[in-house]
């Protein structure tokens, strides 16, 4: 059996799935492959429970490919950015408030598990 695809993506993590959604949205016929079975329950071993900060350019991209409506309710706005310099004897901290430069937050924090669920929903 021969199957034609425009794009084959190796890796079904967040980056690979995001690429699959983006290329699919652009009209390409995409196949995303991964050597491991997907983790479909957040309580299973291998579930990625970390979070990622998506800044303004990423937010615009997620809007463009139709993902943001699936993710917005699960995200938390990043209103304060704290920079910490722990390399000195005395800890140095500086806070920046997004309201000082814009009406929008710096970005949004989103659980990797939530992102993965949104990606899989969008691919269905």
Predicted region positions:
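Glycine-rich FAD pyrophosphate-binding loop
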Residues: 24-48
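N-terminal Rossmann-like FAD-binding beta1-loop-alpha1 element of flavoenzymes
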Residues: 5-32
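Short, basic and Ser/Thr-rich N-terminal targeting/leader segments
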Residues: 3, 26, 76-79
